[in-house]
């Protein structure tokens, strides 16, 4: 998801208007909503200091905006390819045996990454069986990683 779309999604999730966000960033009354609309549409890119302030206002981890983000499957594949170049043993690809179609599984030989994936899986399972709401799931993602990580997959 591109930066502007992330800003828009989180702003709307927080029930904040473009004008309100713009005013809280210090833009004038007449230009506040216009500036935010430009950020969200990709016409303008906020400076790093502005992104930090947007994250504070929207109460999310700033990494939601500062990390480059992967907007397409092609970009995801390129990222995985370069990670594979840096560490040839990191990924293990395999065909899932229980599938009638060709579905490829991927594991990463990195304990930290696996703990992240297990944590995510735990949240998705809770979402799937109704133990958490869509809002709670998004809220968790917006604040990930927490300073004191809780591995919830053990209680699933």
Give the label of every model feature segment:
Residues 1, 12-13, 45:
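Short amphipathic helical patch at the helix-1/turn junction of helix-turn-helix
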Residues 5-25:
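Short basic helix-loop element that most often maps to the first helix and adjoining turn
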Residues 49, 56-131:
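Charged, helix-prone or intrinsically disordered regulatory segments positioned adjacent to compact structured domains
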């Amino acid at each position: 998801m591109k930066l502007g779309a992330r800003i828009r999604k989180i702003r709307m999730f927080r029930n904040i208007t473009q004008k309100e966000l713009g005013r809280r960033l210090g833009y004038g009354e007449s230009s506040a909503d216009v500036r935010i609309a430009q950020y969200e549409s990709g016409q303008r890119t906020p400076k790093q200091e502005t992104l930090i302030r947007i994250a504070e206002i929207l109460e999310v981890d700033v990494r939601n905006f500062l990390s480059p983000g992967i907007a397409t499957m092609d970009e995801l594949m390129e990222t995985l390819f370069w990670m594979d170049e840096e560490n040839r043993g990191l990924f293990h690809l395999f065909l899932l045996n229980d599938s009638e179609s060709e579905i490829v599984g991927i594991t990463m030989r990195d304990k930290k990454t696996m703990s992240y994936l297990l944590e995510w899986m735990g949240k998705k399972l809770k979402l799937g069986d109704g133990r958490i709401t869509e809002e709670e799931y998004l809220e968790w993602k917006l604040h990930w990683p927490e300073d004191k990580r809780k591995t919830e997959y053990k209680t699933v």
